[in-house]
């Protein structure tokens, strides 16, 4: 065999302590982006980072540990996507109208992320987790709020401005969330998976309007 064609041994990289964890996490995020939660495998993450498999255990003792870290990063990315939509909201002279627009922006950001970053979206919700009272900043966006907290804040503002009756505020997160989350999966892998972009925009707009009016 020609020496030039011989497979060269993998080059092992050296990292400072924190840098290796970051490299492994970035590799895990890339895997999730490509194939969802099932693609997040510790051995493959170490291969992509260019280190021996045993090196990972100082930072992630198991695949589950890596998946939890990747999941937190995915939730943070989702929060940032929602924040970006909120930032685009044009403030109205009427506080209630601004509150409604903000709630719609939360739903719009959620759906956009689900469709544009499907692997990360699946990963974000791959493990059952408590959302109320979660103070893990690894799951938060630039505002320091995670996706659930951003939704809660939007609903609080709806109630404060009279756009949402105060007696209907408790638990409203789960009503709005279940509707938008359900639509996301109908588009990702359900009967709407073959819908055109125009059709998806139309049904998304109708659903967000329904959520706003139905709460």
Where are these regions (language model features)?
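Helix-turn-helix
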Residues: 23, 27, 31-65, 69
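Amphipathic alpha-helical packing segments from all-alpha helical-bundle domains
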Residues: 97, 123, 134-161, 170-174, ...
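Amphipathic C-terminal alpha-helical segment
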Residues: 113, 157-158, 177-195, 211-215
């Amino acid at each position: 065999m020609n020496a030039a064609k011989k497979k060269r041994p993998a080059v092992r990289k050296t990292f400072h302590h924190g840098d290796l964890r970051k490299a492994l996490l970035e590799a895990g995020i890339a895997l999730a982006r490509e194939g969802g939660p099932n693609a997040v495998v510790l051995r493959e993450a170490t291969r992509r980072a260019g280190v021996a498999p045993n090196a990972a255990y100082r930072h992630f003792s198991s695949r589950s540990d890596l998946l939890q870290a990747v999941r937190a990063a995915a939730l943070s990315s989702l929060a940032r996507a929602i924040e970006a939509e909120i930032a685009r909201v044009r403030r109205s002279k009427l506080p209630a109208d601004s509150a409604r627009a903000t709630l719609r922006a939360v739903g719009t950001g959620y759906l956009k992320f689900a469709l544009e970053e499907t692997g990360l979206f699946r990963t974000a919700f791959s493990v059952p987790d408590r959302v109320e009272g979660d103070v893990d900043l690894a799951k938060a966006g630039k505002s320091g709020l995670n996706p659930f907290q951003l939704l809660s804040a939007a609903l609080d503002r709806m109630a404060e401005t009279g756009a949402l009756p105060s007696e209907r505020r408790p638990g409203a997160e789960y009503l709005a969330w279940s509707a938008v989350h359900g639509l996301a999966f109908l588009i990702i892998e359900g009967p709407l998976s073959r819908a055109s972009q125009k059709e998806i925009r139309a049904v998304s707009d109708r659903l967000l309007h329904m959520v706003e009016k139905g709460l």
